[in-house]
A protein has these predicted regions:
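A short acidic Gly-Thr/Ser loop motif
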Residues: 39, 56-60, 78-82, 227-229, ...
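Short, structured coil segments at secondary-structure junctions
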Residues: 24-27, 49, 248-251
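Short beta-strand scaffold segments in enzyme catalytic cores
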Residues: 6-7, 62-65, 83-87, 159
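Glycine/Thr-rich phosphate-binding loops that ligate phosphate moieties of nucleotide
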Residues: 1, 6, 35, 89-324
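Conserved phosphate-binding catalytic cores of ATP/NTP-utilizing and phosphoryl-transfer enzymes
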Residues: 40-51, 55-74, 87-91
Length: 324
């Protein structure tokens, strides 16, 4: 349902917002009919065959579907150039108080509207590319894990990759990248490890915001909204990064057998529309975990690490204030 990207729709009704149309003097007649993400929209001819156009979704909504996150509390994170985390909230449109977006998830024709909380991290795998292309610390992206494993930790070094500001949940366009905690003993391996840690730290900030939003709805009671994080995307192949994520977020991280969850979601949506797949239960049987990562870090160490990260982010933002 790409209609939401126009900002002219009412996500609660699934219809165009008549008040906004009137305010902006947009005739309702020029807008297309709103359709679900999984139904037959039309046919076209290709090499003499009639083919159906039967599925459409935004890339992250498609990845959520491809990971078969169909129930409230199920979440996925795509580790690409940036990181994009969506947590399903069922038929409840949660209005975030912690810097997240409320989005409509992809679904089939005839189903009730379902929602998710969404948080975007601007620099995910891009920080590894920066290590490779600009600092020349590694020759290939996969080298980052090799060198990061040569040290037990980052030795107090924090890298905040705010190359183009900070995304969710901070949303600070003025922030700029920083490396803090350097000593005479800091080596390239510490910096590489700190770069990988920054991806996991930023993702944990989004997870914490999601948990806080759900806790607020429940009157501050109940367990965290996210206890399992399904992951995909190129950087999800990095075992060390996935273990860091599990440790920093204190949750199980489950790597998909198919790293291309967005493509899988598109195929699932189209397949359901034309009857190639019977239902969502069949889709669940087609997906699975390649590997799971469980938390190994103590809660005390986790709090110390996250505290250092949040101080580094604060210092990064404070430094940038002088440029505003």
């Amino acid at each position: 349902m790409l209609f939401r990207s126009t900002m002219l729709c009412d996500i609660h009704t699934g219809e165009w917002d008549e008040k906004l149309l009137a305010l902006l003097d947009i005739p309702r007649e020029i807008l297309p009919e709103i359709k679900s993400s999984s139904e037959i929209y039309g046919t076209f001819e290709c090499m003499g065959a009639q083919l159906c156009l039967a599925g459409i979704a935004g890339d992250q909504q498609s990845a959520l579907f491809g990971q078969t996150c169909f129930e409230s509390g199920e979440a996925k994170n795509t580790y690409g150039t940036g990181c994009f985390l969506l947590a399903h909230t069922g038929q409840r449109a949660v209005e975030s108080k912690h810097g997240l977006l409320t989005t409509v998830v992809a679904g089939e024709k005839g189903r009730p509207i379902e929602y998710a909380l969404e948080g975007s991290v601007f620099v995910g795998g891009a920080v590894v590319r920066w290590l490779r292309d600009e600092l020349k610390l590694i020759h290939d992206s996969s080298d980052s894990e090799y060198f990061a494993r040569k040290v037990a930790d980052s030795a107090g070094v924090y890298l905040v990759p705010a190359f183009s500001g900070l995304g969710a949940p901070t949303w600070d366009m003025h922030a700029r990248g920083t490396i803090l905690g350097l000593t005479a003993g800091t080596g390239k391996n510490h910096i590489i490890r700190a770069a990988l840690e920054s991806i996991a730290y930023q993702t944990e900030d989004v997870i914490a915001a999601m948990n806080a939003d759900v806790a607020a709805l429940n009157g501050g009671e109940g367990s965290n909204a996210i206890s399992l994080l399904k992951v995909d995307g190129g950087a999800s192949a990095n075992d060390l990064l996935m273990q860091m994520q599990s440790d920093f977020s204190a949750i199980t991280v489950q790597r998909a057998a198919n790293a291309e969850a967005t493509a899988a979601g598109a195929a699932f949506l189209a397949g359901l529309a034309v009857g190639f797949f019977a239902d969502r239960e069949e889709l669940k049987g087609l997906t699975g975990a390649k590997r799971s990562f469980e938390p190994r870090m103590s809660e005390d160490e986790r709090k110390v690490r996250l505290g250092g990260w949040h101080r580094a982010v604060s210092a990064c933002r404070k430094f940038s204030e002088s440029e505003e």
